[in-house]
Amino acid sequence: MESTHEYCIMNTTPNIHAMIVAAGRGSRFGASIAKQYTLLQGQTLLQHSVARLAESNYIDRCLLVVAQDDSTAQTLSFALPIYYAIGGTERWQSVQAGVEAMINAGADESDLVVIHDAARPAVPTHDIDAVIQAAMLEPYGAILATPVADTLKQSYIASNTLSTPAYEAPLSLQQLNTQPELANSQSGYDTLHTYAQKTIDRSHMWQAQTPQVFRLGQLQQVLNYVTKHNLAITDEASAFEHLELPIRLVTGSRQNIKLTYPDDIILLTAILKAQFASIS
């Protein structure tokens, strides 16, 4: 992909556009409603997340990318002026739809787009401003992230049956995910368990958060590359990584957790209560 490094780095005062991706269902959360509409402290996660963006010194409106059949978002009140785009099946497809909507609305390719998860309502305002300020000085963008603090284990799947033949290698998680029939295909396997294979060096490991902030035109190009080559990505920064384009890491707060599983509600509720108490 042709680099526009020189053009982008000179534009250190770009216009800022905000996008919240809210088209997913949150299957791991397991609720009957989309998790962005979970109520905490009297408001939905989506409303909380928009309110955090509204506190930024750089954001004055927000694009919400929602599912085709979403009938809830437009019934809510938000802390920013809102406009909408229809998302796709995968997160990156929703972001791509949002980028196209922004460009069609007249945004410049050198502008910055701030992409935030609806399920991260506790991001501190100063972190939002910090990652935007960092992205202003980068040719491609910057993201919030935290250094990994816990010990990381790589795992494998195997049985505890001692009669398992030595020539049968343990099943990997990828094998089980893509070929579940293998779970019962190896002789001697009666109960499968997860085991630690090795410890991963965490000295250069970071946990990605949002907001993630990118040059709009560059993001459009890398997402087109993802589409063309049918790549699997879990966040926007990984699209840039496929092309070895540098994305700056900005240390964020550990308060900025993502609501993924039901028991995350306990921690997230406590964080929001503490944050509200500190400003009241």
Swiss-Prot record:
Gene3D superfamilies: Spore Coat Polysaccharide Biosynthesis Protein SpsA, Chain A. CDD domains: CDP-ME_synthetase (cd02516). It holds the Pfam family IspD. GO terms for biological process: isopentenyl diphosphate biosynthetic process, methylerythritol 4-phosphate pathway. PROSITE patterns: ISPD. The record marks 28, 35 as: Transition state stabilizer. It catalyses: 2-C-methyl-D-erythritol 4-phosphate + CTP + H(+) = 4-CDP-2-C-methyl-D-erythritol + diphosphate. The record marks 202, 258 as: Positions MEP for the nucleophilic attack. InterPro entries: IspD (IPR001228), IspD/TarI (IPR034683), IspD/TarI_cytidylyltransf_bact (IPR050088), ISPD_synthase_CS (IPR018294), Nucleotide-diphossugar_trans (IPR029044). One of its GO terms (molecular function) is 2-C-methyl-D-erythritol 4-phosphate cytidylyltransferase activity. Its EC number is 2.7.7.60. Keywords: Isoprene biosynthesis, Nucleotidyltransferase, Transferase. Catalyzes the formation of 4-diphosphocytidyl-2-C-methyl-D-erythritol from CTP and 2-C-methyl-D-erythritol 4-phosphate (MEP). This is 2-C-methyl-D-erythritol 4-phosphate cytidylyltransferase. It comes from Psychrobacter cryohalolentis (strain ATCC BAA-1226 / DSM 17306 / VKM B-2378 / K5). The gene is ispD.
